[in-house]
């Protein structure tokens, strides 16, 4: 699979593990990110909306690799979080370094695949309009 020109209009399932001083974030070990536009996405897990209105930047580098940077308002209860992801489309992997307030917080190591866009949970499902990641 070649790196995509854009993520807009796609939904991507992520399965993997997070490594942090607090252990894995099991509530999001499998989640789907739906890219509504070229700079906004939302995240669902277990049929619940876990992040909404998340800003992101995507840059395809070549036929295989892309950089993806997420800026959620809240992530695992923390603000000031930025996720720096390296997407390898040939291996279908996503590896990220996650900073909180500019300091190392966690890493994420997972696989990715495009999936049909899941039904968007309503504002009263899951965490509602709470933003996170």
Where are the regions a protein language model picked out?
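Short, hydrophobic/aromatic-rich segments at coil-to-beta transitions
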Residues: 7-13, 38-42, 63-69
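Tryptophan-anchored aromatic micro-motifs
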Residues: 1-25, 133
């Amino acid at each position: 699979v070649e790196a995509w020109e854009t993520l807009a209009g796609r939904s991507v399932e992520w399965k993997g593990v997070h490594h942090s001083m607090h252990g894995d974030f099991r509530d999001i070990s499998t989640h789907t990110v739906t890219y509504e536009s070229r700079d906004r996405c939302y995240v669902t897990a277990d049929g619940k909306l876990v992040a909404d209105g998340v800003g992101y930047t995507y840059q395809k580098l070549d036929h295989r690799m892309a950089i993806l940077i997420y800026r959620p308002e809240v992530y695992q209860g923390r603000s000031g979080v930025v996720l720096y992801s390296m997407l390898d489309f040939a291996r279908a992997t996503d590896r990220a370094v996650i900073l909180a307030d500019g300091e190392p917080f966690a890493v994420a190591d997972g696989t990715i695949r495009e999936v049909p866009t899941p039904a968007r949970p309503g504002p009263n499902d899951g965490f509602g309009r709470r933003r996170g990641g």
